[in-house]
Amino acid sequence: MTKRTLGGTNRKRKRVSGFRVRMRSHTGRRVIRTRRKRGRARLAA
């Protein structure tokens, strides 16, 4: 049996699509705004 290698890394996930990263750019802020408007429970990763 082979191992499942696509585990996912929390550090990378936060660095790429975390809240603070989103707030840095204009388009990232737009993402947060849209998700707030839709009433998402989680705005960012």
Swiss-Prot record:
User: Pfam families from the entry?
Assistant: Ribosomal_L34 (PF00468)
Any one Gene Ontology MF annotation carried by this entry is: structural constituent of ribosome
Gene Ontology CC: ribonucleoprotein complex; ribosome
Claim: tRNA-binding is one of the keywords in the record: no
Say yes or no: keyword Secreted present: no
Q: Which UniProt keywords apply?
A: Ribonucleoprotein, Ribosomal protein
Q: Which InterPro entries match?
A: Ribosomal_bL34, Ribosomal_bL34_CS
Gene Ontology BP annotations: translation
- Superkingdom as given in the UniProt entry: Bacteria
Q: Which family does it belong to?
A: Belongs to the bacterial ribosomal protein bL34 family.
Please give the NCBIfam families that the UniProt record associates with this protein. Answer: rpmH_bact
User: What protein am I looking at?
Assistant: Large ribosomal subunit protein bL34
